[in-house]
């Protein structure tokens, strides 16, 4: 059964603290096994990559067979249902429109001393996109990861996707084509992450790796971080719905289940000031649950990690929502904008009853790659800036150096870095 909390209870603070500390993933000790795979690919390249693909994906390939050719992509697109492809095109266009507004501007200015300062933005040259295969194939995630990279100006977007038994999801390939992926390889797991980071004879290395994956993929991303950049280590998905008596309980129940059906470790939370609404949502959820194809997954998620939190007044929900720092925050109240203005920590906010999270997942335009497990306290969802770098620019003339140089020399000497002081002093004809 889901957890029930009431902030009127004397032990609420301790129970809420325990709730925040709840672990939704039991991480197996896989680092050693993952490190062995990563090190093997780093040292033996294609040979290790092909061996791991045969072992884990039951797929025998040669080096040339790893890359998915244009003809195969075209055939996959033709095999897709036209209505779904049209939906992907709509999603692509809206995601691109949203992310183009995130493009930053260069700047160059002169300060009162006459020093020229500024910054310049440039795209990362090559990015690897990991896409899960098999039953967890989500073409929408291809769009969400690849399109911001292309908008940023990334030249090489390299997609890797496992094909257990040799089968690739046609919609994933269609999404890759629509999003502008430049290379696609039928490899997955920790070995694919290693290939992207270190490169092989077949796959040139990238500078950053993004995209979700299983525990081995997450462990591999941790191991290669530093050699390449990574987006984030994503945990199970989560939603918080804040609602008052004006909300529709059937809609809330559907949204809670939409999160629960993702994964048995997903989390769905309702915070409300209405005991009547809470009871109505529970009844609606129980009725809807039995009609879902993924009923076992959704039930496990709701029973194990679901929660209904009753608050005395709606304002009490603000600190709770900020503490949870949910990946998705839906606000179904009489004045959702007013509530949202008080929220500091959330991956994405969905305002009003007609904005279900599912719209943001697919066709809203905003990105659905969002921080989980309370990391919205310090991080943001994926965007254009994740695929760009800012370089500072500084220019002094003789006059400016004469003004700033003595202070730089003093600080260099104070820090025991005499060569620093000398590099300025020589230009000032000082020793």
Swiss-Prot record:
Recall the GO molecular function terms of this protein's record. histidinol dehydrogenase activity; NAD binding; zinc ion binding
Where do the annotations place Zn(2+) binding?
A: 259, 262, 361, 420
Q: Which InterPro entries match?
A: Ald_DH/histidinol_DH (IPR016161), Histidinol_DH_CS (IPR001692), Histidinol_DH_monofunct (IPR022695), Hstdl_DH (IPR012131)
Look up the EC number in the record and give it: 1.1.1.23
Provide this UniProt record's keywords sorted from A to Z: Amino-acid biosynthesis, Histidine biosynthesis, Metal-binding, NAD, Oxidoreductase, Zinc
* Cofactors (names): Zn(2+)
A single Gene Ontology CC term? cytosol
Question: Which residues are annotated as active site?
Answer: 327-328
Q: What class of enzyme is it?
A: oxidoreductase
**Comment on bound cofactor:** Binds 1 zinc ion per subunit.
Quote the record's binding site residues for substrate: 237, 259, 262, 328, 361, 415, 420
| Catalyzed reaction equations | L-histidinol + 2 NAD(+) + H2O = L-histidine + 2 NADH + 3 H(+)
Pfam families on file:
Histidinol_dh
Please state the pathway this protein functions in, per its UniProt record. Amino-acid biosynthesis; L-histidine biosynthesis; L-histidine from 5-phospho-alpha-D-ribose 1-diphosphate: step 9/9
Binding-site positions, NAD(+): 130, 191, 214
Q: Which GO terms describe its biological process?
A: L-histidine biosynthetic process
Q: Does the keyword Transcription apply?
A: no
Q: Which HAMAP family match?
A: HisD
Q: What biological function has been recorded for the protein in this entry?
A: Catalyzes the sequential NAD-dependent oxidations of L-histidinol to L-histidinaldehyde and then to L-histidine.
The family assignment reads: Belongs to the histidinol dehydrogenase family.
UniProt-recorded name of the protein: Histidinol dehydrogenase
Q: Which organism is it from?
A: Rhodopseudomonas palustris (strain ATCC BAA-98 / CGA009)
